[in-house]
Amino acid sequence: GKTMAYLFGALKRSSHVEQEGPTVVSCHTKHLQDQLFYKDLPQLAETMDVPVKAVMMKGRNNYICKTRFDWMIADANTLDEKDMEALLPVMFWLHWTKTGDISECSGFFNSRRTWLKSSFCSEPGFCTGEICNRHRGCYYGQLRQALYRAHTIVVNHSLLLTEADRPGFLPEFNAVVVDEAHNLVKSAYNQFKVEWNEKGTSFLLQGVDPAHPRSMRWNNILQQINEITPGVIQLRDELQDAVKNTQGALKDFMQALRDDNETRFNP
């Protein structure tokens, strides 16, 4: 009931969008975003017999960049067998997706190679109009253009909070509806908190450790670079020693921290 009520108001405002800007609707869950965008908005627009221009938008790293993806699979030497198996569902999914939202591709996430996503998702600095238009483009740029033609913009709380912190991503708007508002404070806490722990730091170090399985891809790239610039492999070995020493120092530091504070916070 309440969903239709605020969407009714949003659609009534659509005739004044040039003067007042679009209506932004923020949700906490992907389920509600999908329900609003794919079911409720079309149903209400048909009932009211009014045209609707709506866009559903998420954070940039949720969208695949076809340029980066093409470049990654073009050089098979940088991928191991498990990497290629994980990317097969993505290749099939690209033939039918209209949004480029990688969360649609459950086969990729079932592969447990989710760190590969950072190698093909849309990225600031890389995904420019000049590069992406030359290589069949990427979905994120198309969505950004559609934002400025939309009457209604459906976002998640994370994106709304990003806009509040660093304005300019969304077009100017004067009306915002926050659905699932009881989750807004929690979303803000998760977004703006600064967190540090041993597990997270160790995981980051593993990403640059040449001896770790997650480093196989860039190890293969270094092997190719070494053929052109001998000596690079020696630097890799030095990095491996440095990471090992840092991991040891991290464990010692965290143990000392626990010893000094365990009785203070756990009497």
PLM regions with names:
Residues 2-3:
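Conserved lysine of the Walker
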